[in-house]
Regions:
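A conserved active-site cap/scaffold subdomain adjacent to cofactor or substrate pockets
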Residues: 100-148, 153-156, 164-166
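Flexible loop/turn segments at secondary-structure boundaries
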Residues: 7, 45-47, 84-85, 140-143, ...
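Nucleotide/pyrophosphate-binding catalytic subdomain
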Residues: 1-117, 122, 275
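Short coil/turn connectors at secondary-structure junctions
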Residues: 1-3, 32-35, 47-49, 70-74, ...
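A conserved regulatory-domain signal marking ACT and ACT-like small-molecule sensing domains
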Residues: 143-276
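Electropositive, surface-exposed helix/loop patches at the edges of structured domains
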Residues: 30-46, 109-133, 170-184, 235-254
């Protein structure tokens, strides 16, 4: 089946938004759920039938779209890992498999940068409480990870997310005036305009720090604009660690033999920016 005849989107070709009403109509009318249907991931088409793509992890998202529209019993996505791990084995030698995750926890992990499941894949499944199974195509008999309504994590372990090659930017007021809501709004507008993704925020009365990802090399241009209004300090090639469900031992593991530039703690999440 040509997926472009089923998934209809807007014309934002590289990260298209789904027209859910039309997509639901196409799938409900033309898919026979009791036979094997094979189609493609990642693609859709706009109102003029031009091909569009669904953005990062678009193939997994395609499965979620079909599952939502067909009221599927479950969705299984196949990866080159045993399932969802509590840490990247490349950076943490004792990484463990998570047997079960709630939708909420999976979305939190994905928001902070966990790469196995994208938030947009989870959202339609959560709406209809359709379970998602993440399994290994290398070892297909392994149980993998289930994502569903219920317990946040099983086993309940600290979860580590690593983002390398980050940029830590600190803005401070030139005249010691407060950094107010209108300043912050302007700053975020500039980051958005320069396609710079903000991964951490910390602010005080006269300073504002962010850890960002300059994927498109726009920082020099942005820095020139910001420097007209703020004193700008920055540190390149830093690493951002996020720990969900942190404890003292988890923090020690991250901080060992590193220079900590910034640390931020909320109820369930600790974020640490380091220079190694």
């Amino acid at each position: 089946l040509d997926v472009r005849n089923f998934i209809k989107t807007d014309a934002n070709y590289r990260d298209a938004g789904v027209d859910w009403e039309l997509t639901q109509k196409n799938i409900s009318k033309n898919i026979a759920p009791k036979i094997l249907n094979i189609t493609q991931g990642f693609l859709g088409s706009d109102e003029n039938n031009f091909t569009t793509t669904l953005g990062r992890e678009g193939s997994d998202y395609t499965a979620a779209i079909f599952a939502y529209c067909l009221n599927a019993e479950s969705v299984t996505i196949w990866k080159d890992v045993p399932g969802v791990m509590n840490a990247d084995p490349r950076y943490f030698e004792n990484a463990s498999l998570l047997n079960q995750i709630s939708y909420r926890e999976a979305i939190e992990l994905a928001f902070y940068g966990a790469s196995v499941i994208h938030p947009k894949t989870l959202q339609p499944l959560q709406k209809k409480e359709i379970p998602l199974y993440v399994k290994s195509f290398i070892n297909p008999l392994l149980k993998g990870t289930s994502v569903s309504k219920g317990v946040d994590l099983e086993p309940h372990l600290p979860c580590f997310i690593v983002k390398r090659n980050q940029l830590l930017i600190s803005l401070s007021s030139i005249d010691f005036s407060f950094i107010m809501e209108e300043n912050i709004s302007e700053i975020f507008g500039l980051f958005h305009a320069h396609k710079i993704k903000v991964n951490l925020i910390q602010n005080s009365a006269i300073s504002f720090s962010v850890c960002v990802e300059d994927k498109f090399g726009q920082f020099n241009e942005l820095n020139a604009i910001l420097s007209k209004k703020f004193k700008v300090d920055f540190e390149e090639n830093v690493t951002l660690y996020t720990i969900r469900h942190f404890d003292e031992s988890a923090a020690t593991t991250v901080e060992k033999d590193k220079t900590v530039l910034l640390k931020q703690i909320s109820r369930e999440t600790m974020q640490i920016v380091t220079k190694e």
